Amino acid sequence: MRQFAKPTIVVSKCLEFDACRYNGEMIPDVTIRNLQPFVTFIPVCPEVEIGLGTPRETIRIVEENGMNRLVQPSTREDVTEKMEQFSNDFLQTISDVDGFILKNRSPSCGTRDVKIYSGFEKAPAKGKGAGLFGGAVVKNFSHLPIEEEGRLSNFIIREHFFTRLFTIAYYKMIKHNKNMKDLVSFQSDNKYLFMAYNQVKQKELGRIIANHKNEKIEVVFENYEKTLYELFMRAPRYTSNVNVCEHIFGYFKTKLKKQEKDHFIELLQKYAEKKIPLSSLLTILKSWAIRFDEKYLLRQTYFEPYPEALVEISDSGKGRDY
C-alpha cells in the first residue's frame, strides 16, 4: 500500500467548517469532507477576519476609476484596504502550504468568475474577475494547486488537483531531508505519472538529478522543484495516457496470451474513443504487474497518485474524460 504525505490546505471556512457565510449558513461539501482524514486544513473566512461579522450585509466588487474596490453597498463602507492588509498578513504566515480550496464566486475568496459591478446596489455587473483574497492567493501561490469547491465536482479537475496536491506534498517531505537517494527514488517511482503529464519536463527532471554540472544539492533541489511545478501546470492529455499505457504494456508482451494482448489493445482503442475510463486500463495493467511480480511497476504512482479512498463510486463507469 502506498504511503502518502499529509498535505496542508487553506480552505474557505464556510465550506464544511463553520456557519460564517453572509447569511449565517455553512455550505456542506463532500470533497472537503472526504479529504479530512488525509490532509491538514487551515480554515479561514477573510470577511469575518476583517470584522464584518456573521450574519452580515453582502459585499461586492465595484470598479471605480479603473480600480476594483470591495464595498458593502448597504453601509457604503469600503473595506478594500482592510481586505488587502489581511490577505498580505495571512498569506505571509502560511509559506509551507500545499494547496487551496476556496469559495467560488465570492467577492473575497473567489479566484475567477466573481462579478465586478459598475456601481453600488442596483448597478449591473460589467465583467468578472478574482476576489481580493482569492486574487492575492493566485498572485502569490500560482505554482500550487488552487481550486474552487464548485469546480472540484468535475472529476478531471478534481483528479488533477489531488494528484498535484499529494505529489507536491511528498516532494516537500523529501526536500526537507535534502537526501539525493530519496530524490532519485521519487523520480523513479513517478516516472510514468510524470510521463503522462509532460514527457519533456519528465526528462528535464532526470537531467537535473543526473547533475552533470556538479551543482550543490540545494541548487539541484531548487531546480527540480521549479521544473516539477511546471510539469503539473495542466492535466494529462488522453494521448499521453495512451502512450504511458503502451509503455507499461510493453513489460508483458512476451508473457501474455494473444487473446489477452488483443483484448488490451481493444480497450486502448475504446479509451481513445471515450467509451471507457482510464481506470479500466490501469486495473488490468496493475493486475499483470502483480501476476508477473514486476516490482518496478508496482512502485509506480501512476496507478495510485492519491489515496484510493478519495475516488468516488460515481466516478466509475464513465468515459475517457473520466
Label every model-predicted segment:
Residues S12, C45, I101-R105:
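Short beta-strand segments
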Residues A19-C20, G24-R69:
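N-terminal glycine-rich anion-binding loop in soluble enzyme alpha/beta folds
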Residues T75-S95:
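Glycine-rich anion/phosphate-binding loops
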Residues Q92-I174:
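Internal, conserved structured core segments that host functional sites
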Residues L144-Y322:
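Acidic, Ser/Pro/Thr-rich low-complexity regulatory regions
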